[in-house]
């Protein structure tokens, strides 16, 4: 894909040392989570090849940017870059397990902080619960997506909505409890298999979530 800037990450991403970090803890109601971004965040997809999974990330970014335009906010997700490599599945699983277990949020892991891009999207072959988390003071976020060969990401329409959902956390939204909406999640009983459908489509946001985004990123939001 010509639109994706190809950047090679040196020093072997597969050798990155696992470190614990806690994602934004899910909330039971819709609305804004952490502090808003102070700039348009660039995105780096970490994966082995410029393939179908990268295309899904680009489509999810385009979905969010269309939505921002529709609700009248100047905020956008920035350009999508590509880094050939991987973050070890055991590292991502350890972070995912900590997210579910709760605990205090540590500083951003050095290996994530040093990666290109403000939002790092890790497409993994591992089996863990996908997650999205932010470190607002560092203007950094990590979105980790489990293998699309494992249930439920192997179901039609699920992976694209999981990617969009986790990007929603990186943008600043929490979970809600409506299984017909994109941001439904724990502690509500809805799970990613609720996204399954024969035709590709992105699930919508609640009106309250759209209002929260407009409050986080108003007309005068300073895009720097």
Question: What residue spans do the PLM features occupy?
Answer:
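N-terminal secretory signal peptides and thylakoid transit peptides that target proteins
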Residues: 2-16
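Hydrophobic membrane-targeting alpha-helices
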Residues: 17-21
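Fold-level signature of zinc-dependent metallopeptidase catalytic domains
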Residues: 27-63
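Residue-level signal for beta-strand positions within conserved beta-sheet cores that form or flank
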Residues: 41, 73, 178-179
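Metzincin-family zinc-dependent endopeptidase catalytic domain
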Residues: 51-170, 174
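Metalloprotease/metallohydrolase-associated module, dominated by Zn2+-dependent proteases
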Residues: 139-153, 157-158, 174-224
């Amino acid at each position: 894909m010509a639109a994706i800037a190809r950047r090679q990450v040196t020093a072997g991403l597969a050798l990155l040392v696992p470190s614990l970090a806690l994602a934004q803890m899910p909330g039971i109601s819709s609305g804004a989570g952490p502090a808003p971004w102070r700039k348009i965040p660039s995105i780096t997809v970490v994966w082995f090849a410029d393939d179908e999974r990268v295309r899904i990330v680009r489509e999810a970014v385009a979905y969010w940017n269309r939505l921002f335009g529709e609700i009248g906010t100047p905020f956008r997700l920035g350009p999508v870059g590509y880094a050939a490599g991987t973050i070890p599945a055991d590292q991502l699983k350890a972070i995912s397990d900590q997210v579910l277990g709760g605990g205090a949020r540590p500083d951003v892991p050095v290996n994530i902080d040093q990666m290109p891009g403000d939002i790092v999207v890790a497409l993994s072959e591992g089996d863990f619960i996908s997650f999205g988390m932010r470190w607002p003071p560092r203007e950094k976020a990590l979105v980790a997506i489990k293998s699309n060969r494992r249930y439920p990401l192997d179901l039609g329409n699920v992976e694209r909505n999981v990617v969009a959902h986790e990007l929603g956390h990186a943008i600043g939204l929490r979970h809600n409890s409506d299984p017909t909406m994109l941001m439904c999640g724990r502690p509500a009983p809805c799970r990613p298999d609720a996204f399954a459908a024969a035709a590709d489509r992105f699930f919508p946001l609640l009106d309250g979530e759209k209002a929260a985004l407009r409050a986080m990123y108003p007309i005068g939001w300073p895009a720097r």
